[in-house]
Amino acid sequence: MARPKNVKYVFVTGGVVSSLGKGILSASLGMLLKSRGLRVAIQKYDPYINVDPGTMSPYQHGEVYVTDDGAETDLDLGHYERFLNESTSQASNLTMGRVYKSVIDKERRGAYLGGTVQVVPHVIDEIKDRLAELAKNGNYDVIITEIGGTIGDIESLPFLEAMRQMKLDMGDRNLLNIHLTFVPYIRAASELKTKPTQHSVKMLLETGIQPDILVCRSEKPLSSEIKRKVGHFCNVNNLDVIGLNDCDTIYEVPLTLLQEQLDLRVLKKLGLKKFKEPDLVYWREFCNKVKHPTSGEVTIVVCGKYTEYPDAYKSILEAFIHAGASNDVKVHVRLIGAEAAENEAYDFARELEGVHGILVAPGFGDRGIEGKVAFIRYAREQGIPFFGICLGMQCASVEFARNVCNLAEANSTEFNKRARYPVIDLMEQQKKVKEKGGTMRLGSYPCIIKEGTKANEVYGKFLINERHRHRFEFNNAYRETFEEHGMVFSGTSPNGELVEIIEIKDHPWFVAVQFHPELKSRVQAVHPLFHGFVGAAKSYAAVGHQPELAAIEPHFMPEPTAEAYAAYSEESSAESKSFFPDNGGHDEERDSGQ
């Protein structure tokens, strides 16, 4: 493995239990190093055999995070983007399935010259080569790699072996391991217990890896005595035992780690001396707004299909935190399963009392669709601010067709292939697609916004780029009928063929989009649609009439370049060729609970 000069590597592992927050830790460290002037790349290694999480159920994996270049990735990449305010890519997520697939493909091509293909060296070398490629293709000072899973899992062993070999080759000054562990608080004894951490480090040592820094998650702050004890039994300097007790919000984690001097310990161990003091004024102000808003609170319902597992809507929930801060309000989110509203006895007035906005979330498959349509109808008829995303836009189109355009049998061909009025239909270029994984319309595409619309008002521009993940689209055969009944098609593809945004003008806020705006909302760049929607809910809570949008800084959505616009404008009318040629996807099989 040829390593570019001067690139330093940080690997983040986890022990004791899963879900300790390795992604938040990695993102926080990346943000702190970036704030000191370093160029940081961050990536996630997942040990599962799936090529990507695109075909995995939301109940098992949570949200699938889509990047600009059309990669379907782990939700931790969302944390990376939100904390670092930088876009990730296909290179930012590597699964063991992708590694094995690459090795097997090479073997079939005869790349190993008749040799016996083994985990060592071939699989390990593939992992190391992927990391070297990332370093070579970017101008980075530090590359942070989060290894998914928990120490002791058999699936993670190849990644750990690759890290061990790299550290042996590069030396301690070029690669370090941060191990995240759990120090439980036993209430009966009023004590923090370090034994689980000791055993976790012992298991890591069995792989040949001595952790350089320990970050200890705990309910209570770690005393200096506890840190000395952990350091003594884990063969780590007590200065390298970092306490990370529970925070009120994940956005306080970087501030806690800064206070614990994690970034300084990393810089010292890697021999990085040229850096500046971090400027975290904006970050502190943001956390203060999240914890102590001064303009009241709003309650927003998220109607979805996977509401038992909030991680399925991770980016939506985080976008509401950003939009709450930008509107100086506390946003309370209530997750409601769409199937509940399919019961004729469902009392919307009682169940939605005190609700100031309704968001109908993305999803796949026909389960709960009629419930989503019912929620949309209630929001439209009662003048409650409404926001639909992806499937939410498609359901809004079905509802409008049935109850406003008098097309009672309107539906999407995803749910009824013989629908009398197929207002939502499979995209033309998808009709010959047979494979599920890696075949949807994925990644960033442009959208032209119509002047004088709500979309134009919140974006403050006419050309935007947004991320997509879908196969079905609005059927243009019904555009004229919809417009005659008051629907505004406020955003389309540059060639005008694909509907991207719809809205109703005589409504406080009724906006639905085919793309996924939640994937581009960040701490330092709140998404304008979420900002506008929460602003509408805030006004609805106060006076119940047409909202006045709160002011927002104009820097949050970078303008596409003229070259990008020209490239998109030259697409065919069917838009069959993606700007990113390696896009992929899948659909309804993820809804394992249909």
From Swiss-Prot:
Keywords of this entry: ATP-binding, Glutamine amidotransferase, Ligase, Magnesium, Metal-binding, Nucleotide-binding, Pyrimidine biosynthesis
InterPro entries assigned: Class_I_gatase-like, CTP_synthase, CTP_synthase_N, GATASE, GATase1_CTP_Synthase, P-loop_NTPase
Region ranges (Disordered): 562-594
Enzyme Commission designation: 6.3.4.2
An annotated GO cellular component: cytosol
Pfam families: CTP_synth_N, GATase
Root EC class: ligase
Reaction(s) this enzyme catalyzes, per UniProt: UTP + L-glutamine + ATP + H2O = CTP + L-glutamate + ADP + phosphate + 2 H(+); L-glutamine + H2O = L-glutamate + NH4(+); UTP + NH4(+) + ATP = CTP + ADP + phosphate + 2 H(+)
Keyword Nucleotide-binding among UniProt keywords: yes
Amino acids binding L-glutamine: Y59, G363, L391, G392, M393, Q394, E414, R471
Compositional bias ranges of the Low complexity kind: 562-571
Role according to the record: Catalyzes the ATP-dependent amination of UTP to CTP with either L-glutamine or ammonia as the source of nitrogen. Regulates intracellular CTP levels through interactions with the four ribonucleotide triphosphates.
PANTHER family in the cross-refs: CTP SYNTHASE (PTHR11550), CTP SYNTHASE-RELATED (PTHR11550:SF0)
Complex and partners: Homotetramer.
Name under which the protein is recorded: CTP synthase
Organism: Chlorobium phaeovibrioides (strain DSM 265 / 1930) (Prosthecochloris vibrioformis (strain DSM 265))
